[in-house]
Amino acid sequence: STGGTVLPLAVNVREYDHLESACGNIIAKFGRLDVLVANAGIGHFAPIDEMEPAKWEELIDTNVNGVFYSIKACVDALKKSKGYIFTISSLAGTNFFPTASAYNASKFAVTGMTQSIMLDLRKYDIRVSTIMPGSVTSHFNGHTPTAEDAWKIQPEDIGELLVDLLKINPRTLPSKVEVRPSRPPSA
């Protein structure tokens, strides 16, 4: 939509106090928080025998702790608004592949954590969904999108999905949504 008010905030999702401050700034500006999208993520890919512990820790801290911190910092505001929480996991949260032990571990964790949080927060009329996309065109992991990425899910497709989910009658909760490209590239 157009004509809305935006409050740009830069935060480090690995720092809980940054997220508490951001949520406080949102409440101060808008009076409430209706939707949280926990979407920060990084990827380090290497076989386990080559994975550097510092890379593992950075990935888990961003992908798992960042989701937890985001939700924890905002949950009281979302209780008041009976809001909606979206976490962005991945198909890598239920499927595994070589060189992805850290990434798979983080996305399995996000998927499981989100489903448990959904059960915890339903009693407050907070809806919680995890979105599990497959290949998305993005700058993830240093990639520069090109025309060859046209077959992939586009970021705006995920945005449209979230808007559609917000429109569903609150009595219905799509708790885990897998999304794939309709037509993968030919071999």
Placement of each model-derived feature along the sequence:
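Active-site helix of classical SDR
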Residues: 71, 106
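Substrate-binding pocket helix/loop in short-chain dehydrogenase/reductase
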Residues: 47-48, 55-57
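Residue(s) in the substrate-gating loop at a strand-loop-helix junction
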Residues: 90
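The beta1-alpha1 cofactor-binding region of Rossmann-like NAD(H)/NADP(H)-dependent oxidoreductases
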Residues: 10-21, 53
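C-terminal helical subdomain
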Residues: 126, 130-131, 138, 147-187
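Active-site loop immediately N-terminal to the catalytic Tyr-X3-Lys motif
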Residues: 49, 95-101
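Active-site-adjacent segment of SDR/Rossmann-fold oxidoreductases
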Residues: 95, 116-126
